[in-house]
């Protein structure tokens, strides 16, 4: 059974907010060696890339994620910044971070938003 989950079909996501000139890319990956399908445990990692395409700096202040497994159970992740940081992203620069998301089903999805402000 485990071999069926070695290379699941995974979709990357990119969104561009034309009004604020911020582009967000999310690149998920299935981590087979940390997963245990026989125990309904599927481990996914993801990389987030935030590109500031505006003319000035922005600061990431909050994140709001909804993680939904294949059984439609949802978890909510809300908090200040990401990975303990509230990064200031200069004009033309990017910020990247990695995190993970274990699921109890082989499929699922994530959606959410980031809140930014112009640093003082």
Where are these regions (language model features)?
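Asparagine-centered strand-capping/turn motif at beta-strand->loop junctions
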Residues: 50-54
